[in-house]
């Protein structure tokens, strides 16, 4: 994950001081891309421990189309707590848009099921895309989508994915985002009888919060370790039937975790 550390250093060296919605303040750059060959290991940051349980459960939650944090709480995941209302609802965030995008005539489009069908039946299509950026519902969402748009690509029997992330918290959020989409590529590839290819991450406003600087310098002082390996222990009948216990990460030997405040 040397690329990730290089991005951190680039933001420190080249970033512009900006104000932001949370009032915290950031160092920010605009436009950055990283490419991870998923054949070479699972891209889970090793210069600090990442909470893999949260990453897996959040993705399973998205894929169920869920937008209430009850499932996350049942599994001791608290990463969405700050944005939920008193009933645990978040409004029409990722899961709703992925699985039930509303149309003007009252129908709902399951973008994930559509993408799966495209990958199986028309893998050369240039329209294998999922968007969470529903302009008509942004004002109903507790938090507008940060990882907003992703596209799949099949070549030589390998499945690749590119994500556009319009806003990126480099220290806290980005390690989660990279691992989450890498996991999704592995799941999609298994369901479509493909090998994994690349995960390409493209960032828009890519920033370090002003209260993450000490933690960033600590992380940059650490040497990356070998990437772990993802093992999927069974192939469910459907993408929507995976369970937490289906996934195992082998050889994950990270440096200790580094705590940092979340900007709300």
UniProtKB/Swiss-Prot annotation:
One of its GO terms (biological process) is dTMP biosynthetic process. Keywords: Cytoplasm, Methyltransferase, Nucleotide biosynthesis, Transferase. Its EC number is 2.1.1.45. Pathway: Pyrimidine metabolism; dTTP biosynthesis. It catalyses: dUMP + (6R)-5,10-methylene-5,6,7,8-tetrahydrofolate = 7,8-dihydrofolate + dTMP. The active site is at 146 (nucleophile). One of its GO terms (cellular component) is cytosol. DUMP binds at residues 21, 126-127, 166-169, 177, 207-209. Its main location: cytoplasm. SUPFAM superfamilies: Thymidylate synthase/dCMP hydroxymethylase. GO terms for molecular function: thymidylate synthase activity. Pfam families: Thymidylat_synt. PROSITE patterns: THYMIDYLATE_SYNTHASE. InterPro entries: Thymidate_synth/dCMP_Mease (IPR045097), Thymidate_synth/dCMP_Mease_dom (IPR023451), Thymidate_synth/dCMP_Mease_sf (IPR036926), Thymidylate_synthase (IPR000398), Thymidylate_synthase_AS (IPR020940). Belongs to the thymidylate synthase family. Bacterial-type ThyA subfamily. NCBIfam families: PRK01827.1-3, PRK01827.1-5, thym_sym. Homodimer. Catalyzes the reductive methylation of 2'-deoxyuridine-5'-monophosphate (dUMP) to 2'-deoxythymidine-5'-monophosphate (dTMP) while utilizing 5,10-methylenetetrahydrofolate (mTHF) as the methyl donor and reductant in the reaction, yielding dihydrofolate (DHF) as a by-product. This enzymatic reaction provides an intracellular de novo source of dTMP, an essential precursor for DNA biosynthesis. This is Thymidylate synthase. It comes from Salmonella typhimurium (strain LT2 / SGSC1412 / ATCC 700720).
């Amino acid at each position: 994950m040397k690329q990730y550390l290089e991005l951190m250093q680039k933001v420190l060296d080249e970033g512009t001081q900006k104000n932001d919605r949370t009032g915290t303040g950031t160092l920010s750059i605009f436009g950055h891309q990283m490419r991870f060959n998923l054949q070479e290991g699972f891209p889970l940051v090793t210069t600090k421990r990442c909470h893999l349980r949260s990453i897996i459960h959040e993705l399973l939650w998205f894929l169920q189309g869920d937008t209430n944090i009850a499932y996350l709480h049942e599994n001791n995941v608290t990463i969405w707590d700050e944005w939920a209302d008193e009933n645990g609802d978040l409004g029409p965030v990722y899961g709703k848009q992925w699985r039930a995008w509303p149309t003007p005539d009252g129908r709902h489009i399951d973008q994930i099921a559509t993408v799966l069908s495209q990958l199986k039946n028309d893998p050369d299509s240039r329209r294998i895309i999922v968007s969470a950026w529903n302009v008509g519902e942004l004002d109903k969402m507790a938090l507008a989508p940060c990882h907003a748009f992703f596209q799949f690509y099949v070549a030589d029997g390998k499945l690749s994915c590119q994500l556009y992330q319009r806003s990126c918290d480099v220290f806290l959020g980005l390690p989660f985002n990279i691992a989450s989409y890498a996991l999704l590529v592995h799941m999609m590839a298994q369901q479509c009888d493909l090998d994994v290819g690349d995960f390409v991450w493209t960032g828009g406003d890519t920033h370090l919060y002003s209260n993450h600087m000490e933690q960033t310098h600590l992380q940059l002082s650490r040497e990356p370790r070998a990437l772990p390996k993802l093992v999927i222990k069974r192939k469910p009948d459907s993408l929507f039937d995976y369970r937490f216990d289906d996934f195992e990460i082998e050889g994950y030997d990270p440096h200790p975790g580094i705590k940092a405040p979340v900007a709300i």
